[in-house]
Amino acid sequence: MKKPVVIGLAVVVLAAVVAGGYWWYQSRQDNGLTLYGNVDIRTVNLSFRVGGRVESLAVDEGDAIKAGQVLGELDHKPYEIALMQAKAGVSVAQAQYDLMLAGYRDEEIAQAAAAVKQAQAAYDYAQNFYNRQQGLWKSRTISANDLENARSSRDQAQATLKSAQDKLRQYRSGNREQDIAQAKASLEQAQAQLAQAELNLQDSTLIAPSDGTLLTRAVEPGTVLNEGGTVFTVSLTRPVWVRAYVDERNLDQAQPGRKVLLYTDGRPDKPYHGQIGFVSPTAEFTPKTVETPDLRTDLVYRLRIVVTDADDALRQGMPVTVQFGNEAGHE
């Protein structure tokens, strides 16, 4: 074969290889990464925070619920009574604290001073009587028992005088700081009990925390529940998340904020739109639910993809194909 012909064939082959490589690269760029996942199953068990008898339930299995909707109520009467008791406790504690702060009135101080004078007079009389009895005892005019009775009366009068003096001193100086602090602490305790009673009454009504669909209703009216007992199981419908897994080789394509297209078997020509919201920082072995055979034994990273245009046709647990094409990434 002539040399020019050989060179020509080599050029043709090289051009074909280059063209093929370019076509493969371009095709890969156009098609992008494809992952397989499922719409995340998100359920929550709803319960009353307090216990009691179920008075009414407003929804049944299959009903759509909205955030803030009343779902059920316990018998409120026990909690209303507890609330009234707590309010009364606050009133008593407040009155006692106010008395401690205000101190004693002038009339009370005057009465205490009069009591001191009376006790002083009684003591003086008892002391004088005891002194006379001592003289009579020395002359053996009275018995030892008479002298002991006089001493006892004197000591009792002295104790009464001291008590009256202490009371007057307290009235004039006001209440001790420790007594005021104790009264304040009692008031704060009563206020905390009132807040707890108000919260318990509020929690005897079950409110939907978010939108969703009621899956199960575990009890009926008349049931006596312990606190925390499950009443409903709710499937959360918003937001809708897709759980998918990516291997380390393609991890750089799955960045938070990256937009993707989501395909389901029911509408293969009309994709949903999503955005990667979370990429797990740790690798894990591929879960059994992943449908891609070549990822079965790989270490992968979990993705959470938020569906931005979800509708009722996108059900929890549904398999989804995640497409990372250029069109999705730059929308």
Curated annotation (Swiss-Prot):
Superkingdom of this protein's organism: Bacteria
Localization per record: Periplasm
GO annotations of cellular component type: periplasmic space
Signal peptide extent: 1-15
InterPro entries in UniProt: CusB_D23 (IPR032317), UPF0194_membrane_YbhG (IPR022936), UPF0194_transport (IPR050465)
Primary localization class, coarse: periplasm
Pfam families per UniProt: HlyD_D23
Keywords annotated in UniProt: Coiled coil, Periplasm, Signal
Parts forming coiled coils: 107-208
PANTHER family tied to this protein: EFFLUX SYSTEM COMPONENT YKNX-RELATED, UPF0194 MEMBRANE PROTEIN YBHG
Record family assignment: Belongs to the UPF0194 family.
This protein's name: UPF0194 membrane protein YbhG
Organism of derivation: Escherichia coli O139:H28 (strain E24377A / ETEC)
